[in-house]
Each structure stands twice: as C-alpha cells, then as structure tokens.
Amino acid sequence: MEEQIKKQRINGILHMSDILNQILLGDCVKELKRIPDRSIDLVILDPPYWKIINERWDFEWRTKDEYTAWCMEWFTEISRIIKLSGSLYIFGYTRNLVYLYRNIVELGFVFRQEIIVDKGMRSLGGRKTSTYKMFPTVTETIWFFTFNSKPYIKDFLRKRQKDLGLTALEINKRLGAKVNGGGVWSLYTGNNILAQVPTEEMWTKLQEILKFDLPYTEISQTFNIELGYTNVWSDIDFYKEKRLHKTQKPVKLLDQKRVW
C-alpha cells in the first residue's frame, strides 16, 4: 500500500481508493493538491485563530491580509476537492472568521449557519475578567457552509440540452410543467432569481429527457439532523480528555452523528 501511494504521489493526483481511511501527513496545501476534484463529502477545519491563543504559531501572520491570503491558499484547494453535495465546518473566533467570509463565498460556498458550543465557565481558566472591555468568551464558534451546486447544475443541464438539440419549450412539455415565462426549466438553467436545485423527482425526469447518469446524491445536500438538537451545543465536555494542545477539540465534538 505504501509503495503504491508513493508511486501515485510521483504522478501527482492520488487515487481515492488508496487514501480512504488513511492519514496524510505533510504540508496541508501540498497534500490537498494531490486529492482528486470533487471527491470529498465533508471538510472539518480548525485553522490557527490568529492572535487569539498566546502561542507563537498563532502570531505567524503580521496583518489581517497576510492571514487571509494564507487561508485562501488551502481554501481554494478545498473548493476544488469538495463534492457539489459537500458540507464544510470551520472552527474559529467570529471576529477573525469575518475576515474570511467574503472570500469563502466567492469560492462557491453558501453560509448556512453559525453553531455555538458552550464550554462553560471553566473555560475562563481563572483569568481575571474584571478588566475586560467585553463579555468573557466561554463559547466555541463553528461556521457551517455547503457548496453551491447550482452554477454547476446550470452549466451541466444546458450542455446536455445543446448536445441533444432540445428547446426549453420541448423540455418543459416533457417535464409536464407550464411552458409560459420560461417554465420550470428556467429555474435550473436561466438567470432566475428563484434559481434552485431540482428535487429528486425532477432530477429523475431530467435524467430521462436529457439522457445522463449523474446520481442525485452527487448534486444535492443531505442533512441528518436529529430531533431536539439546535445550533447551540451545551453537552460537550472540553475538559474530560487529556489535553495535548491549547485548542484541542474533544472527540465527542468531532463525532457528532447529529450533524455530519
């Protein structure tokens, strides 16, 4: 296995069957470049917060622009490897995450939600908070994004339409949809402000009409949220496990079957 992976690395892009359930140890950006396009379902990121933790590694970037540029090096690769149906979670402090927001969205991600993890008063660690000029932070912030598959779907369907020589009117009729004002077809391929991802039922019809075999699971997000859970998590013990790193995340937090 190791020799096979080495050969793959010499040739560049790795084969997913060789790295599934494996840990890639190396420079993040370099290793990301070797992962195939649109092959990753879920990305969980915990980058340096930047000037939050009193450690040398959190002060490597002098300015906001330097930090943002570095983050975009690996975020650009992530936007390439994540599936159209993929999800992304990034840990951080809101006051620094906001520096990344615009760039992340421009890479094709859609902001879905902010998740707050309540770490409790113990997270203050005996610090003197009376001199603070803000409320003491006892939470962990996670931003949840999905990848915007609509532009890809639009281009893909329009190409199939062109290849088959079909008109929008013909497609709408075969879909059993209204044909005035562009019809339902324009929701997927036009410049419609109500642009949307087709339902699974509609996708099946489009497969038959446009003669393609692209599974619905490849273009549409699936959410496995358990009843009773919200975007505030207060059942995670940050102090039960042995801590080897100042921003270490508990195993339970990363094993959230409620979400990912």
Language-model features and meaning:
Residues E2-W260:
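Core catalytic lobe of class I
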